[in-house]
């Protein structure tokens, strides 16, 4: 866990520069949230810079172990866009995009499957298991966890074939339930069999897959890691960061969101529609952002809830 903060002319060590009473205050602030979420399931979508930077990867693994050890049940769902692009380039396979979406040919799908299940998943499982035998990797193919339907998005006004890309349409969470009941931390790769042809595997959006799994598990929260502070009402005005937004308010905003943020916010909507009480978008570039969200009173990032209304984060001083 990070022990020091450094910058030009600045150095802070949490061991030596916090008084004993200040350390106690931090722990006491977490108490009501430890009580509220004890025994609860929380689905975390792992992505962005948090899965590229070595320090952030280690911090994320520590967060998952912390959650498990204080009585929560974390479930991780991950993609791996940067790693897939890197491997395709190394193999001399051209990456093609249409409307910002990767075209996944059968050749590219083999690479997607290999990278997600054989590289990204194994690395994260290893980082978590450095702290004890907690994590188990599986994909959306295992135990028929996910079933997906091939997607033809509308690009420039017409349905467009982008290859072996799909959306999760059903979830059988029994394999994940078994792991949770055994005290494990499931780490799920976002590939899934095609509902129309079980021999064919589709590359599915990890945000959407995490939302579907959160709903199927009856999770208390969906937390999506991003490379921004949260959802802004008027980007690039940084004072317009939203702290809390109702799902219907968010639904109205979706058509105007940038392409990178839209699938993440759509995942939050899907989770709330599926009965998940809270969905969060937080900045995964900040070490231990998961713990800051769950165990502090104000939290961080943007929280989506069933109730109407919008609150700016500036209104409660964080």
Curated annotation (Swiss-Prot):
Keywords: Amino-acid biosynthesis, Arginine biosynthesis, ATP-binding, Cytoplasm, Kinase, Nucleotide-binding, Transferase. CDD domains: AAK_NAGK-C. Pathway: Amino-acid biosynthesis; L-arginine biosynthesis; N(2)-acetyl-L-ornithine from L-glutamate: step 2/4. It comes from the Bacteria. Pfam families: AA_kinase. It catalyses: N-acetyl-L-glutamate + ATP = N-acetyl-L-glutamyl 5-phosphate + ADP. Belongs to the acetylglutamate kinase family. ArgB subfamily. This is Acetylglutamate kinase. NCBIfam families: argB. Catalyzes the ATP-dependent phosphorylation of N-acetyl-L-glutamate. It is found in: Cytoplasm. One of its GO terms (cellular component) is cytoplasm. InterPro entries: AceGlu_kinase-like_sf (IPR036393), AcgluKinase_fam (IPR004662), ArgB (IPR037528), Asp/Glu/Uridylate_kinase (IPR001048), Glu/AcGlu_kinase (IPR001057), NAGK-C (IPR041727). GO terms for molecular function: acetylglutamate kinase activity; ATP binding. It comes from Bifidobacterium adolescentis (strain ATCC 15703 / DSM 20083 / NCTC 11814 / E194a). The record marks 45, 264 as: Transition state stabilizer. It is an enzyme of class 2 (transferase). Its EC number is 2.7.2.8. Substrate binds at residues 80-81, 102, 203. One of its GO terms (biological process) is arginine biosynthetic process via ornithine.
């Amino acid at each position: 866990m990070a022990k020091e903060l450094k910058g030009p002319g600045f150095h802070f060590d949490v061991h030596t520069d916090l008084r004993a009473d200040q350390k106690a205050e931090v722990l006491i602030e977490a108490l009501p949230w430890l009580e509220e979420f004890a025994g609860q399931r929380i689905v975390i979508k792992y992505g962005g810079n948090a899965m590229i930077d070595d320090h952030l990867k280690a911090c994320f693994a520590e967060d998952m172990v912390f959650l498990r050890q204080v009585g929560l049940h974390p479930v991780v769902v991950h993609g791996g866009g940067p790693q897939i692009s890197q491997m395709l380039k190394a193999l001399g396979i051209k990456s093609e995009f249409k409307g910002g979406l990767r075209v996944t040919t059968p050749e590219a799908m083999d690479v997607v499957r290999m990278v997600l299940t054989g590289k990204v998943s194994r690395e994260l499982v290893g980082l978590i298991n450095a702290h004890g035998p907690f994590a188990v990797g599986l994909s959306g193919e295992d135990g028929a966890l996910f079933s997906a339907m091939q997607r033809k998005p509308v690009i420039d006004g017409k349905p467009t074939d982008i290859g072996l890309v799909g959306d999760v349409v059903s979830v059988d969470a029994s394999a994940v339930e078994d792991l949770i009941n055994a005290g494990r931390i499931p780490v799920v790769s976002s590939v899934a069999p095609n509902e129309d042809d079980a021999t064919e595997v589709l590359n599915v959006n990890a945000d959407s897959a995490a939302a579907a799994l959160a709903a199927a598990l009856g999770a208390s929260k969906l937390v999506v890691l991003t490379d921004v502070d949260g959802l802004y009402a008027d980007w690039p005005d940084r004072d317009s960061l939203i702290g809390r937004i109702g799902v219907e308010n968010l639904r109205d905003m979706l058509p105007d969101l940038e392409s990178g943020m839209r699938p993440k916010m759509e995942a939050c909507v899907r989770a709330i529609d599926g009965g998940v009480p809270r969905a969060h978008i937080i900045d995964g570039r900040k070490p231990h952002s998961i713990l800051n969200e769950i165990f502090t009173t104000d939290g961080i990032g943007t929280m989506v809830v069933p109730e109407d209304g919008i609150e700016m984060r500036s209104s409660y001083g964080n």
